[in-house]
From Swiss-Prot:
It comes from Schizosaccharomyces pombe (strain 972 / ATCC 24843). Its EC number is 2.3.2.26. This is E3 ubiquitin-protein ligase pub1. It is found in: Membrane; Cytoplasm. One of its GO terms (biological process) is negative regulation of L-leucine import across plasma membrane.
Amino acid sequence: MSNSAQSRRIRVTIVAADGLYKRDVFRFPDPFAVLTVDGEQTHTTTAIKKTLNPYWNETFEVNVTDNSTIAIQVFDQKKFKKKGQGFLGVINLRVGDVLDLAIGGDEMLTRDLKKSNENTVVHGKIIINLSTTAQSTLQVPSSAASGARTQRTSITNDPQSSQSSSVSRNPASSRAGSPTRDNAPAASPASSEPRTFSSFEDQYGRLPPGWERRTDNLGRTYYVDHNTRSTTWIRPNLSSVAGAAAAELHSSASSANVTEGVQPSSSNAARRTEASVLTSNATTAGSGELPPGWEQRYTPEGRPYFVDHNTRTTTWVDPRRQQYIRSYGGPNNATIQQQPVSQLGPLPSGWEMRLTNTARVYFVDHNTKTTTWDDPRLPSSLDQNVPQYKRDFRRKLIYFLSQPALHPLPGQCHIKVRRNHIFEDSYAEIMRQSATDLKKRLMIKFDGEDGLDYGGLSREYFFLLSHEMFNPFYCLFEYSSVDNYTLQINPHSGINPEHLNYFKFIGRVIGLAIFHRRFVDAFFVVSFYKMILQKKVTLQDMESMDAEYYRSLVWILDNDITGVLDLTFSVEDNCFGEVVTIDLKPNGRNIEVTEENKREYVDLVTVWRIQKRIEEQFNAFHEGFSELIPQELINVFDERELELLIGGISEIDMEDWKKHTDYRSYSENDQIIKWFWELMDEWSNEKKSRLLQFTTGTSRIPVNGFKDLQGSDGPRKFTIEKAGEPNKLPKAHTCFNRLDLPPYTSKKDLDHKLSIAVEETIGFGQE
């Protein structure tokens, strides 16, 4: 009997979804997932209230064959009985593409959610786990297998139900796209219903793994190979594809890793390659040697797995392999960056995953001797009121610190300095040691003192050193402008002939602080963090560096400059009294800026002011930084999170804050002002820092306290102004350190509205 007619019982765990689309402005969805197998087996998860990142972790057992199609749809329970059913996305999987039922195994998959036939907007990913059970294989008659696929997807009207059901449904309303398209045997000859082929098959049969059939605008059929990201007019066959895949595995294993990351929506190219060469027990190997402490072994069936002797754990995932995930942000949760990380990564040190007697996954933290249903690598679902930024940063930080590259090496790294010469001594000590030595346990000793470093000395060391090395006196860094206190690289640091060596040293110091989980007492302009993350700088980044110059560039874009400005594609740089003209493009000083090319001029001058003129210094800094912190790991964070990772959250003096706060249309004795300060006393230090970041643009407090807060036009105290309607959220004006606070009628309403504004706001919309 053919393998496609053999049925086996597997476990499908719907773990979580991440970054779902928010269709309502003021309300979050209540997501639940519906699992359907070949249109006849249906299971439903419970609904998770008010979240875009639901965590279900529910397991269902289903009978499948290699040709079975698993459809998982996500809906909003609030809208399930309305038109559209609150559809949030769907994925379709062919079992044989991701799991070999004959061998068995366990696969954790992350898939992009897809649109339905109605083409509604969909965002986000879903994480599922497929695993075989020890039960014996069931034989399913061919006729039954064929007939089962003529049924349509069934969904119960009660989303809370977890019972299997099979109810006929109109195909036109199916939200799974075509869950019944599949690789089933052809319909009975007696049936006159025409056969509809999916994009992965045609009249000659199913395409090889990783291939897709498409039609151009002239109706011609062509084929897409997602494994190699190429197209052809010639229909592929299994033998030629298997041979090419095997050759590629031997010649360029790393290219499979890149393909796997670039096409996450194409059912994972590397897994398809694995399926095509399964008969030879080949696997998609990572490039290079295994990390220290890792070993590759094989199961009795010949499947490779990997042993981490550092943490005494095993995994199916090759530690040399990376996959790409997207970061979401900005308007409409749009994709803003792709970052290479593992799908979930290993569990943090001291954690263990176990199963209950009902096969539900739970996690044991041996560090605190506690258990939880929540995967520590995912956002916490214990409290759905936890703000999104906190769940994301917590998840990223746990992943970041759990990576082998961030684990201290055996041994100790001794650094001895004099307090009065901490900059010079640190430069000599840190630059004489190799990057490997700096990854050992850090032991700081101050000359003439008997203290032992169990954390306190190294924290004080980084605090004192950061005050010295970022001092503008050394000409390495400067304040972003005369009206701010954040730092930027001094473009004229070349007055110090050793400046590039010092920038490499500073890169090592910041990398050292992150590696050993310490903070430096300095905050930089946003563009500096973006350059570390290798993100593109924009005109908006100019505002934190030079607000006046930023407004001038915005004026150029917003107004007709014909006959008004006499500009060329060049800039003048004043270097210690000497004015130098620099071309922004070849022969730029002779090219006039017009209404037609002014956008190009603004883009070029922005890149020059922020990036080009400090390129040499930053490259030296980045060389030292990357010796300790791998680029692919630091890219997990965004620029705001990186600011907290490097600088931490400073203590806030409430009395100093109150003393140096101004009021407009309010007075200190107004009830809402009293409520505001009561809330500040009640809020955590992290939340208060978030409010400062929301209002002033940074969570950093000046060294001399709130009295030194600066705005875009000079000294500006923290200001609370009466503005807006009571049903609106507060607004922030970061250039003027001003919070527009509507006259709310209760302390509870003030707390709620202010919390939403501070915690749920993503990106800049401030004036």
